[in-house]
Amino acid sequence: NTRLVGSEMCIRDRDGAGLANIKFDVSPGTRYISRFRSVKSQPIKNIFQHVNQRFENLYASDPAKLKDVDYLKANEAFTGELYLGHLRYGTFGKNSKENCHPFLRQNNWMTRNLVVAGNFNLTNVDELFDLLVNIGQHPKEVSDTITVIEKIGHFLDQENNRLFKEYNEKGYNNKEISSLIAKNMDIPSILKNASMDWDGGYTMAGLIGHGDAFVLRDPNGIRPAFWYEDDEVLVVTSERPVIQTAFNVKWENVNELKPGHALIVKKDFELKEVEINSPSNLQKCSFERIYFSRGTDKDIYKERLMLGSLVTPQVLEAVNFDLKRTVFSFIPNTAEMSYYGMIKATEDYLSGVKKKKIQELEQN
């Protein structure tokens, strides 16, 4: 029952990449959060080489241990149940390893640990930074991701404090309280309070140390999010074709996360899609759909064909309708579908020209 949440590791290298993993139910004194980030020229390849090297070394020294799940979980990194991967396309801050997601907020209490990665661009980072300062925090830098993780972390701490006080007053001891907090944490409330002042497009994925996870989408649906669940896994990505290819499922089996909603995944695999912020006017990001997303998505494919068709009149005017001396091509590769739409519309235009000339001949 491995859960994959927010797995955003596609084959297109950008400014860096990162991978985090959380193990369930490990003994105190055992590391349960693993993370590795890379800004190498091929960051994804570098990440998998780093992770796989551990198992290659183990295979060389003691192959039998590769089949010992208990040993692996107790001794090797990246052998947990919960994963969060991210590909960085930098639009804010420096392109350094420290700016690569996932970001980690650590604490000795399991339920206060937070791992966050996202596809987002907030327009009011300075305002959010000031809000953190006004509540007494001292953020180490002005960046959108640090601001987001500290904002979520602040309300995660408050939820921990609330539950601790509640169960302490009921007479539970500290060890019992830790388990009760993990079981009864109100994640929707945390996300609602944390995102109240966010302005912009975002899909935020987060893992909490004890095993809960969430993915939150902005109310306008600016940033995309899709999810799929079966008997073995739950996976969330920014692009539908990734899920279709990796899990060999049909388009209709992949769900779109509703704007303003969060997918909440409890450690016991209970799954809920909850409204966090009231959905507003749908404003899907044109950059995502026209340029960045895979053209193999059914909707994206149709939109790009239509885009090519719609720009054709302007293209024809720009070349003064002199198609004999016009060469059609496309840049970059993601414009290929739009190119086919433009060619189809141009062929339709030429068919109209031929029809008109035939009609003129008949009249003469």
Can you describe what each PLM-predicted range is?
Residues 1-3, 7-258, 264-327, 331-332, ...:
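Conserved short alpha-helical segments that host acidic/polar catalytic motifs at enzyme active sites
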Residues 335:
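C-terminal substrate/ligand-recognition segments
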Residues 344-364:
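Short, glycine/charge-rich flexible loops or terminal/linker lids adjacent to PRPP-binding catalytic cores
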